[in-house]
Amino acid sequence: MKQAVFKSTALKKPADKTFSLFSLTWPIFIEVSLYMFMGNADTLMLSQYSDNSVAAVGVSNQILNLIIVMFSFIATGTTVIISQFLGSRQKKEAMEVAYVSIGANFFISLAISAVVFFAAVPLLHMMGLSDALMPDAKVFLQVVGGLSFIQALIMTFSAILKSYGYTKDTMFVTIGMNILNIAGNFVVIFGLFGFPVLGVAGVAMSTSIARVIGLIAMIVIVNKRIQLKMSLKKVFHMHKEHLRKLLKIGIPSAGEQLSYNLSQMIVTYFIAIMGAQALTTKVYTQNITMFILLFGTAISQGTQILIGRYIGGKQFDAAYERCMKSLYWALGIAAATSVLMTIFSKDLIGLFTQSPDIIATASLLIAMTIILEPGRSFNVIIINSLRAAGDAKFPVYMAMISMWGIGLPLAYLFGIHLGFGLAGIWISFIADEWVRGILMYRRWRSRIWIQKGMA
């Protein structure tokens, strides 16, 4: 992408800082990519230690991923509400929301972290973990999960910085955390510099230490950039009206994510019925095609910040046009990258496996992304735009109806009952994404969201 492409999208001073979609989006793209990498780095590096440790950490990460979704709802509300207040030049109120979001996410995440620490074993038993894997999984979940409130605070500070347009700062912190995490993993897995080989426990400590340092960096940067002083009195003073606004945006957003994750767990169960090869094919295919989603995710987050400001400044036409332009770019990029991946699909899958059956099936699934990913772009872009406008409930209702009323039934019908296998599952994904995408598009075109602004 070239910066010139996005010049016409520049936000014209609804606050002190002027920025374009491009200036917001490229750091977010790198940050999201690195967060995905950091989530997989522990597993990848532990594969050099033992297969059991990989399995144990993999199961623990499934629980941790659900916890992250629970933390994200405050961060989502923070981005929207602060952006709206800045757009309407209510800087004092924007600062108050920042304090409320830090305090609220601290209390919520601390409580969840405590539950995870003390209930680690029952939670792992619920996942069907074998006794052989329990010791490693317990250690990892208790250390990383017990300190997961640190990640919640990082997400909150990151949301605050992004709302003010400082997306590069959050990117650099994420880069630093990745470097520290990988370096620490090397030390504790391979026993470098005289350190003992600590395996899973060492990796858990390495991950947590990297996050602690990342949090400290975030606090320093927020203080420097927006003069947000870490006063306990201000952080723990819960401004009821601001908290209500955060929850009004955040809770529906979390509900949508939880609904999606739960529906995907059921889809995974359907695929498990097809056998281990089908599961392996699904993992390889989604690991490859996840790259397509990263572009849409970055564009949607940058768009959300801009639209939040436009809504706060009552620039509704500008907000409408910003969403539509972002949608067109996301559709074009999704289509182009899907076609490229289809052309080189066999080479890409060959990086993971030499199985002819897996390569053939995965190639078909990647070809189907040419239809799937543009539909997903509608949802990724417009849902975040609706949230930025304060219209958070509609996407949740439509998601539940489409995922559970269309996606899952079709997954069973085509994948299991009619015997189409993974191709049938992908057909259900296409149907779900396009039905929701069209509904989101109609909602945005209706401009009902103009009535939902919160600041």
Swiss-Prot record:
InterPro entries xrefs: MATE_fam, MdtK-like, YsiQ
Xref: PANTHER family: MULTIDRUG AND TOXIN EFFLUX PROTEIN MATE FAMILY, VIRULENCE FACTOR MVIN
Domain of life: Bacteria
Sequence similarity: Belongs to the multi antimicrobial extrusion (MATE) (TC 2.A.66.1) family.
GO terms for cellular component: plasma membrane
CDD domains, alphabetized: MATE_like_8
Name of the gene: yisQ
Pfam families: MatE (PF01554)
Protein's name according to its UniProt entry: Uncharacterized transporter YisQ
Keyword Transport (UniProt): yes
